[in-house]
């Protein structure tokens, strides 16, 4: 089993940002991947969509507050992007290379995850990767978040920011090996 903790950093900005922190952990046990996200701080400054009664696959979740992760196979250009909304909606996309050949990943018909909100917001996803990769393949992972603020500004959070603009697809930012 491989377990690591993480802290996300906002893309550098000249704007004053609300007092927020995004931390969590990621674990891979055989081909089960579990990611725990924790958003803490001034949540009143964040637009958090209400939890829906039905979790559905939706596009463009990254236009609102959304937790994301990217999975790449070591020594391969292909990768997957997973989007998880605090409302319970989700999507998964497959790419053949950097921002190339984006298609909805049909190996997943559901992507169940849990969302809890009190003084902070937590989201936990547990996914069986057997449908897309072998347990013997090494994963390169990027963990990210898009935070929409109550003043309609958006901030982009990641383990690291490798470009001159926020770009979660840059392979250099897939920093966690599992």
Predicted region positions:
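Extracellular/luminal beta-rich ligand-recognition
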Residues: 55-108
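Acidic/polar low-complexity flexible segments
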Residues: 58-65, 73-79, 135-178
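Beta-strand elements of well-folded, non-transmembrane domains
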Residues: 26-28, 39-43, 73, 127-131, ...
């Amino acid at each position: 089993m491989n377990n690591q903790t993480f802290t996300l950093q906002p893309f550098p900005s000249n704007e004053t940002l609300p007092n927020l922190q995004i931390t969590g952990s990621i674990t891979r046990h055989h081909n089960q991947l579990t990611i725990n996200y924790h958003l803490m701080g001034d949540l009143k400054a964040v637009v958090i969509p209400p939890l829906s009664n039905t979790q559905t696959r939706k596009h463009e979740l990254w236009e609102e507050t959304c937790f994301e992760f990217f999975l790449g196979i070591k020594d391969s250009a292909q990768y997957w992007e997973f989007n998880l909304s605090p409302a319970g909606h989700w999507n998964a996309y497959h790419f053949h290379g950097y921002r190339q050949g984006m298609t909805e990943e049909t190996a997943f018909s559901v992507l169940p995850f849990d969302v809890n909100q009190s003084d902070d917001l937590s989201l936990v996803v547990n996914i069986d990767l057997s449908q897309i990769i072998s347990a013997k393949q090494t994963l390169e992972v990027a963990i990210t978040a898009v935070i929409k603020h109550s003043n309609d500004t958006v901030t982009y959070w990641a383990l690291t920011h490798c470009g001159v603009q926020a770009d979660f697809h840059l392979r250099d930012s897939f920093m966690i090996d599992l």
